[in-house]
Structure formats: structure tokens, C-alpha cells
Amino acid sequence: MPKKKILMLVGDFVEDYEVMVPYQVLLVAGHEVHAACPGKRAGDKVATAIHDFEGEQTYSEKRGHNFQLNATFGELDETAYDALVIPGGRAPEYLRLNPRVLEVVQHFASSGKPIAAICHGPQVLAAAGVLQGKACSAYPAVGPEVTVCGGTFVPASSSFDNAHVDGNLVTAPAWPAHPAWMRAFLEVLGTRITT
């Protein structure tokens, strides 16, 4: 399996599990992962948020860990990467307002490179205009954005543990789907894990 170079777009209050788990899983699988945030440099940190499902009408939010960046967003050359990961949390709400972020996402989509997005991550895909004609899972509150931009929203299972693959696009509704989401993304990357 050839090692892939993967870009992870993050920002302050990215969901804690949704940044930490895929970052570590992809490293364990032998890939190189660069995490970058607009306005920050390699070595800087982003704050994370922990979202949980505790029985209320929506998720709860608590302060999470700090996550250290290992790439500088202002120096990115998206053509040097094989795949893209967009975690959820609060960060996609403002990342989607950055024209350079949208340009980076559009490069991956138009080049047919693998893209993985989870929870609120598809907000960035919707803003970049790359969901037209695609089926996509996301946190339920993001469903209307997927639909209004021409995508087909794939609802979460009752346990939020499903992932959906549409060509090079791998999406999931929230962190309970990490096993299915990462398994599907690794398959799209051509990574084989055997027991």
C-alpha cells in the first residue's frame, strides 16, 4: 500500500473526537496527515469541543483538548495532497466562509481525490458547491444544506453509527460512526487492514 499524504482542515472548536480519532487512525494506517487551520501556523493549537448525546433535543457541548497543528494553512499547496478530511464541530461554521478553504475543497472534488467529512464537516462541502448530485450523510441539522445545494441527504441511523460512500466522498453523521467512516475511507484510499 503506498503511503498517502492527507490534508485535514480544522479550526477552533472542531469536535474533539472527530479530529483526534481520524488523525490517529490515518497515522496508524501508515499515512502522512497534515492538519491546518486558516490564520494559524504549524505548532499552533486549535481548541476542540466535545459534543455528546445526553438525551436533550440536541447535542451538548463542552470544552475539549487542544489539538496541535503540524501544517501552516497559508503555505498549503493542495495539489501535493492525495486526500482531504473535514471533521465536524463548530469549526465548519466559519471555515466555510473562507474563500481559500472553499478553493482547496473544490480542488479535491474536481480532481476526484478522496474526501472524508463527518458531522458538520459537510457544511464546508455545501458552501464549496461540490455536493451537486452527490449523496451525503451529515449531522441531521446539516441535512437542509446538503439538499439545498443539490445533494441527497443520507439520514443517520438511530445510533448515528452509519457511513455513506458516493464515489470518492465518504461521509458520516457524527463520531459514533468512526469505525464505519474510517473503514470506508481507508478502503477508498486503497488501504488494506487485515487481521
Enumerate the predicted regions with their spans.
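Short, thiol/selenol-centered motifs that function as redox-active sites or metal-ligating centers
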Residues: I118-G121
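Extended, subdomain-level signal for the structured scaffold at the beginning of enzyme domains
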Residues: M1-S111, V124-A135, G143-T195
